[in-house]
Structures are given as structure tokens and as C-alpha cells.
Amino acid sequence: MSTPSKKRLIRDFKRLSTDPPGGISGAPCADNLMIWNAVIFGPADTPFEDGTFKLVLTFDESYPNKPPTVKFLSKMFHPNVYANGELCLDILQNRWSPTYDVAAILTSIQSLLHDPNPNSPANAEAASLYRENMKEYVRRVKATVEASWLDDGEMPESIEEDDEAEAEAEAEATVDRSAPQTASA
């Protein structure tokens, strides 16, 4: 049975597949629509340029009324990323809005790579270096970028492009078989 959160995630996936913002990609796991794998490419003209950073987004049935949990799987050195990969990002906390979709979340994270907020640090060392020793901060970030190229951390199996049509058809069939349709945000 398809729930409002799953219907919304299907819509988010269709949008992300047909009109992806530059430098990001994401898809639900093949066996669980509520867990997504994503990749953010480091923004140009930043120390993160050329990096390939893996993330996992975990949704629950309260989405889109509550934000997903988002965590970098790739090692990060950033003022707003905790050692465990979780983010300190206002839209994932007190500034969340149900109008945000997966593309908006990933774009916001990419923007955070471009413009860190050292005044709200999750990583005090990175924030301190960002403010006081940019040369060392950049050196540490570039080491993270290089590590992202070698990152062979396994991510759960995602829907591949060839399987997208099949997954969409299956998802739509689930939606079509569900109880009476109601409009949802």
C-alpha cells in the first residue's frame, strides 16, 4: 500500500530524474523507497571541487512534514559536518518546510559545501581552520577530496537507469491499487 510519504518520494524521484540540478544525483534503494543514495560533486571554485561525496537520506512516514535524516558516507572535513557524517544544516532542522523535496535538500547541501557556516560548527577544528588558517583548511579539504576518489565504501544497491522505468511502473501500480486517492502536498 502506498502512503502519502511514498507517493511524495515517487514524485521527488521523477523530478530528480527528469530535471536534475547540476552536480547532484540521487535515487531510492531498489528494495526500499524510504532510503536514498545520493552523490554530490564538489562545487567548482571551492576546495571541494572534483570531489565525489556519497550520502544516504533516510525518510520516515512523516515526510514531507518532517525532514529526512541525511548523512555523508564519504569522509568529510567541513565546519558543518559532524565526525559521523551528519550535517548541521538549518533546513534539516528548525527551518524545514514540506515544500522542500529531495532535489532542494541535495542542492542545499551542495551550497553548504560552497559556503560553510563556521558560526554554527559541527566540526570545531574545521570551523577554526576555516576562520583562522585557510591554507591548512584547504589542504585538509583537498585530502578529503582525494579520499573521495578512492572511496569504495559500499552503498546499498540503488535503482539503476535501466531499471528506472520498471521501478516507476511498479510504484505507479502500487499507487493505483491503493485506497481512495486524496490530494497531498
UniProtKB/Swiss-Prot annotation:
Transmembrane intervals: none
Reactions performed catalytically: S-ubiquitinyl-[E1 ubiquitin-activating enzyme]-L-cysteine + [E2 ubiquitin-conjugating enzyme]-L-cysteine = [E1 ubiquitin-activating enzyme]-L-cysteine + S-ubiquitinyl-[E2 ubiquitin-conjugating enzyme]-L-cysteine
GO molecular function: ATP binding; proteasome binding; single-stranded DNA binding; single-stranded DNA helicase activity; ubiquitin conjugating enzyme activity
EC number in record: 2.3.2.23
Task of the protein: Catalyzes the covalent attachment of ubiquitin to other proteins. Plays a role in transcription regulation by catalyzing the monoubiquitination of histone H2B to form H2BK123ub1. H2BK123ub1 gives a specific tag for epigenetic transcriptional activation and is also a prerequisite for H3K4me and H3K79me formation. Also involved in postreplication repair of UV-damaged DNA, in N-end rule-dependent protein degradation and in sporulation.
Family: Belongs to the ubiquitin-conjugating enzyme family.
UniProt name for this protein: Ubiquitin-conjugating enzyme E2 2
Organism: Mycosarcoma maydis
Upper classification of the organism: Eukaryota, Fungi, Dikarya, Basidiomycota, Ustilaginomycotina
